[in-house]
Amino acid sequence: EWNEKTYPKNLLRESINISKRCIFSLDQLRYSYPNEFVPKGLTKTDYLHRLTTHGLKKRWPNGAPKEIYEQINHELALIKELSYESYFLTVYDIVDFAKKNNILCQGRGSAANSAVCYCLGITEVDPTHINILFERFISRERNEPPDIDVDFEHERREEIMQYIYRKYGRNRAALVAAVITYRPRSAIRDVGKALDIDFGQ
């Protein structure tokens, strides 16, 4: 039963004021990527720059072309501006673990447009051999976080997953499934393939 002693009017008024201040649009919600572990005394920006510079020297032992240096500086500046350093460091760490343990892996997709990903060993597409368009991968205007696809050899994927669980903890890492729906045409085509029926039939 309501009474003013239990629920003073001034407190009720204040709760209404608080609720008004809690109104927001879902458009305002932004995912904040967790900070990655970095060596003591370094910031995530410093560490990403150090790893990229080290990879640059490995990829081009006799020195990279001028445009590659410019491209890397452009990419690192945008990565810093959009606060994506931790994401790159996480993917680098996982790929580095795989390579040190002779687990086959390959970065693919729009990340191949990144000279930084090439220097970090995430992708294997030499940016001097293609006309890279970094903005296909990360763009200030698109305002979407980067998405680096990395494939690992099927037989040893479990080792990668266990490494991630050990490093980040099971409360901070999870498997995510992508579910697709078959359309009639593609379903019939795949059934035909499985039954070795020619598509023309």
Annotate each PLM feature:
Residues E1-Q201:
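Phosphodiester-processing cores and adjacent nucleic acid-binding clamps
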